[in-house]
Amino acid sequence: MVPEAWRSGLVSTGRVVGVLLLLGALNKASTVIHYEIPEEREKGFAVGNVVANLGLDLGSLSARRFRVVSGASRRFFEVNRETGEMFVNDRLDREELCGTLPSCTVTLELVVENPLELFSVEVVIQDINDNNPAFPTQEMKLEISEAVAPGTRFPLESAHDPDVGSNSLQTYELSRNEYFALRVQTREDSTKYAELVLERALDREREPSLQLVLTALDGGTPALSASLPIHIKVLDANDNAPVFNQSLYRARVLEDAPSGTRVVQVLATDLDEGPNGEIIYSFGSHNRAGVRQLFALDLVTGMLTIKGRLDFEDTKLHEIYIQAKDKGANPEGAHCKVLVEVVDVNDNAPEITVTSVYSPVPEDAPLGTVIALLSVTDLDAGENGLVTCEVPPGLPFSLTSSLKNYFTLKTSADLDRETVPEYNLSITARDAGTPSLSALTIVRVQVSDINDNPPQSSQSSYDVYIEENNLPGAPILNLSVWDPDAPQNARLSFFLLEQGAETGLVGRYFTINRDNGIVSSLVPLDYEDRREFELTAHISDGGTPVLATNISVNIFVTDRNDNAPQVLYPRPGGSSVEMLPRGTSAGHLVSRVVGWDADAGHNAWLSYSLLGSPNQSLFAIGLHTGQISTARPVQDTDSPRQTLTVLIKDNGEPSLSTTATLTVSVTEDSPEARAEFPSGSAPREQKKNLTFYLLLSLILVSVGFVVTVFGVIIFKVYKWKQSRDLYRAPVSSLYRTPGPSLHADAVRGGLMSPHLYHQVYLTTDSRRSDPLLKKPGAASPLASRQNTLRSCDPVFYRQVLGAESAPPGQQAPPNTDWRFSQAQRPGTSGSQNGDDTGTWPNNQFDTEMLQAMILASASEAADGSSTLGGGAGTMGLSARYGPQFTLQHVPDYRQNVYIPGSNATLTNAAGKRDGKAPAGGNGNKKKSGKKEKK
């Protein structure tokens, strides 16, 4: 039954020899599994459950990318990923795969990832008896002389069986006869061949020919056979046969030896003479197939030469049988054996196969990350087959040997996509032969990006200068920012943030394009309103996590000449009359026109000129000071009423201008002359009303202050009683500074901004208790001009200066209730003539001092009861403002009024230029400070 089962090929899968050897079980990366399977199994034949044998999780095969890797062009095996069974995928013919090799093994690799593991599976293909022995010829003819002595051996044709092992050729059988016997011999490669042995002398006359049958049998079950008819012709005697000088010859030859290379020369001799002694050499009948294609034999000389191309990897040793025959009528032959050893040369370059590539690789991949798996083979032997692999130096990769002929490509240093986004690795495999042969393959490794770079800019801050009255929506800045990461991580978003506690600047004044970083203004900017903006550009990328960069953006508004000069004195719309006695000499200071400009720099520099008067030769005006003086003595013929129109121009481009009108009355300095101008009584009545309201306000504020103080004291006492161990009640002290001045502080709520602080100074020699305004808490009178009188509430301005008064920029009616004496004329010394050709101030500080001085003069000029000749140290101001009036009391017109032409600087008693009050005013200053503290 067993032979019949093998013959029908119905061997069940349960009878497969499943020899499983787990070699190196402690090292999973080097596990080798062995299976044995007969050849010629049908497609789908189950070999074994390789997944279970490897200890792998069947459910994770797809996730780990389980696959079969085979270097052959045909894939003989596959693995069912659902069951884990390995099955036959293609026809297995052992003779086709391995020829006559004693062992036939098909090797394949199984690869799984996450983590990357490699398993080797060796399937031994078992031979079955599927091939009959075969003779190279259909029949064999022998000519044997009757003189041949018994015991002579005659080689017979050898049969060839492709099967191996027990299924190969095992023996020969000879048909029954009375002359010959059969002797079966074994070669060095364990193959069998037969020899015909003469046991009884032949008698040609009795039997001139013989018919024998040679049968070749293999060892299979059932045994297969082949028959060869042998025709023997009995010849007449040639009693001497050739003899070789040695029965075995050995030779060594390089596998790359060219055709025609001599291998060995055999030599045989025959004692006969004549044709019976002439020897002819030929290949014996026992040679294996292919010998005649590789070697050539000279029939006369017996020289064995190379005919074809030898291959050490195919056959390492060739066994050649040579026979020698004479030329006699009945030639007898002699035989010898030649063993040709093929010497290996390094004629095969290594072969590289990339079995798995992990790409792209994240640039933050840790050291030792597996990138690719490579298999390297070399068909040469010995040192010629020893292969090493290498990558070019200087790259962040290395090769390590994991299994025999397998190399793992790993990372050996940190990767940076921004530096090198892609590598084309030239992997070289080199053997140890001489000369060394090599192979080259390219492995492409892409580096994937991670968000490891924040947005970058060429500069950390930007200073932008933009002219006021700009066009809304026009770009003012394009931020130059980039991100070296990949496009997704480098997608930038721009935002504007505000610096400090001030809010609302971004949505009110500026905006930024979120995609391209272009900053634009939303509204026209006003230099006089705000000169500087401090913003922060926040740039974030599109990566995860988000990286960001902040850039400071400082926007400076530059001035344009968009404000015409304004007249401070004489007040616009008012009736300003200056008295000029007849007989006044030339150079007498008549009055001073005071103007200011809301612009800055050159745009605020003012110049004065007379447009017209009844007598052009009588008056002259300082170009830069605005001082009007007599150009010649006043004569009796001069008109008693002179109307002067002063043109005030700034220094901008284009220049803007305004005019001021001043009336000069030439009088005899008598009461009748003064009565000609009755309009001066109105300001006095206004001043009476103003004084009344100021006193009433002062009383109300004082009462409120006292009530507040008492309330605070009562509250403190109450708290002290509750926790007398922890708190001490403060004692409030009121100080009254002695002196001629009555000083009261008042905070005017509701009419002005809360940050403005106003002080009212009442002096004992003031007839109408004229008020002055100051900016509170300023260390210098030259602070920002954004809080000057031009921003005051007009109602409050009229309440302080009188019902007919107007804030700067509005002209008030003239005040005729006073007259200037020579000592009371406006001027830096009270009596000196103005310098019409004076130079511009030397520096900004001098300019600011002069502006403050002229504004103070303008305030006195607006008051008909004041004088302008205050003496030294007061810059021409009234004596009543001497101790108290410092630069602290002047509204901040430091950049709005520029009247050059004088090099004089304002100094205090100590000669300093910081605008501090002199020693005589310390009492009032301390009193004011205490009230501010409260």
From Swiss-Prot:
| SUPFAM superfamilies hit by this protein | Cadherin-like
List the carbohydrate attachment sites.
245, 424, 478, 550, 615, 689
Q: Which SMART domains match?
A: CA
Q: Does the keyword Cell wall biogenesis/degradation apply?
A: no
Q: How does it sit in the membrane?
A: Single-pass type I membrane protein
- The residue spans the entry assigns to the Cytoplasmic side of the membrane are as follows 715-934
Which spans are transmembrane here? 694-714
UniProt KW Ribosomal protein keyword: no
Q: Spell out the disulfide connections.
A: none
Assigned keywords, A-Z? Calcium, Cell adhesion, Cell membrane, Glycoprotein, Membrane, Repeat, Signal, Transmembrane, Transmembrane helix
Please list the residue ranges annotated as the Cadherin domain.
32-135, 136-244, 245-352, 353-457, 458-567, 572-685
Query: Where is this chain compositionally biased, Polar residues type?
Result: 812-843
Signal sequence span is 1-31
GO CC annotations on file: membrane; plasma membrane
Q: Where in the cell is it found?
A: Cell membrane
**Basic residues: which segments have biased composition?**
924-934
Q: Where is this region: Disordered?
A: 804-843, 904-934
BP GO terms, sorted: calcium-dependent cell-cell adhesion via plasma membrane cell adhesion molecules; cell adhesion; homophilic cell adhesion via plasma membrane adhesion molecules; negative regulation of neuron apoptotic process; nervous system development; synapse organization
Residue numbers on the Extracellular membrane side: 32-693
MF-aspect GO terms? calcium ion binding
The main location class comes to membrane
InterPro entries reported in the protein's UniProt record = Cadherin-like_dom, Cadherin-like_sf, Cadherin_C, Cadherin_CBD, Cadherin_CS, Cadherin_N, Protocadherin/Cadherin-CA
Name the job this protein performs: Potential calcium-dependent cell-adhesion protein. May be involved in the establishment and maintenance of specific neuronal connections in the brain.
The molecule here is called Protocadherin gamma-C3
- Originating species: Homo sapiens
